[in-house]
């Protein structure tokens, strides 16, 4: 496995903060838009028309679904529950299962080249190490292993004391790699987990399925603020991202979407809309 600093260290990093932006190229800044943006940036990084990217994004109440979630036997009941609780639903184009987003959850996309020579595990490990470095002054107890009972469980769940606060997914476009992580920073993590648990209850109704959906236990989830005993905000964590990135690059630049990126974004946005219409 490659050293994580070798994977992330680049002379120049492009920094994009979409956390408070209301629209992107004329499209409302929703989670659907975010996945199209990351695909666009992965293409640019792959074609070397952009340096590697760190992008920050935050969305109001959204349940991001995986493709298996869209195949629940009673998905209409699950979707109705989501809407009744004032969440919108988006089916993502990367791996994983349902995740709850709101203003207390910071999403970070690390978009780098190397799709042909970096393994999936190399990239997951690099993100784990990056997050550990971000909070090294507060804790050395961030671990990566599957937290049974969490939503969107996986080998690279991030937890403190056995309670999960983050999950990682990954998507590859050409030679570009987008490693995405959600960080539960502040707010009611228990309520987020309850919504996901009830979504599965409504969508499955105890029916036997060939796919194993998680049996969500809100007690195994937590926010960073709660787990660290520090009143962290999303803004605080954004500053930590930049501070850590400064140690891994010679310069950080902010570049708006270029002409070709706008073209690619519109194409990828249409694909995301179509994906969500067909699910």
From Swiss-Prot:
Residues 48-253 form the BPL/LPL catalytic domain. It catalyses: N(6)-octanoyl-L-lysyl-[glycine-cleavage complex H protein] + L-lysyl-[lipoyl-carrier protein] = N(6)-octanoyl-L-lysyl-[lipoyl-carrier protein] + L-lysyl-[glycine-cleavage complex H protein]. The record marks 164 as: Lowers pKa of active site Cys. Its EC number is 2.3.1.204. SUPFAM superfamilies: Class II aaRS and biotin synthetases. The reaction proceeds via a thioester-linked acyl-enzyme intermediate. This is Octanoyl-[GcvH]:protein N-octanoyltransferase.
């Amino acid at each position: 496995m490659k050293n994580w600093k070798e994977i992330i260290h680049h002379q120049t990093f492009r920094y994009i903060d979409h956390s408070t932006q209301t629209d992107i190229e004329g499209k409302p800044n929703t989670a659907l838009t975010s996945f199209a943006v990351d695909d666009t940036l992965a293409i640019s990084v792959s074609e070397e028309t952009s340096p590697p990217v760190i992008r920050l994004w935050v969305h109001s109440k959204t349940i991001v679904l995986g493709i298996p979630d869209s195949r629940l036997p009673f998905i209409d009941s699950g979707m109705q529950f989501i809407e009744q609780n004032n969440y919108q639903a988006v089916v993502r184009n990367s791996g994983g299962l349902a995740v709850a987003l709101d203003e207390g959850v910071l999403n970070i996309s690390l978009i780098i080249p190397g799709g042909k020579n970096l393994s999936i595990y190399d990239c997951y490990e690099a993100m784990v190490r990056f997050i550990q470095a971000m909070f090294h002054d507060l804790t050395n107890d961030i671990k990566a292993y599957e937290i049974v009972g969490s939503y969107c469980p996986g080998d690279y769940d991030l937890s403190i004391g056995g309670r999960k606060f983050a999950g990682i997914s990954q998507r590859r476009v050409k030679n570009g790699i987008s490693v995405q992580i959600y960080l539960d920073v502040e707010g009611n993590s228990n309520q987020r987990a309850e919504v996901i648990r009830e979504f599965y209850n409504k969508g499955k109704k105890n029916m036997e399925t060939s796919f194993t959906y998680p049996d969500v236990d809100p007690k195994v989830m937590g926010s960073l603020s709660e787990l660290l005993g520090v009143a962290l905000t999303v803004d605080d964590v954004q500053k930590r991202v930049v501070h850590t990135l400064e140690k891994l690059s010679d310069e950080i630049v902010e570049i708006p979407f270029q002409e070709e990126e706008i073209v690619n974004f519109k194409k990828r946005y249409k694909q995301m809309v179509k994906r969500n219409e067909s699910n």
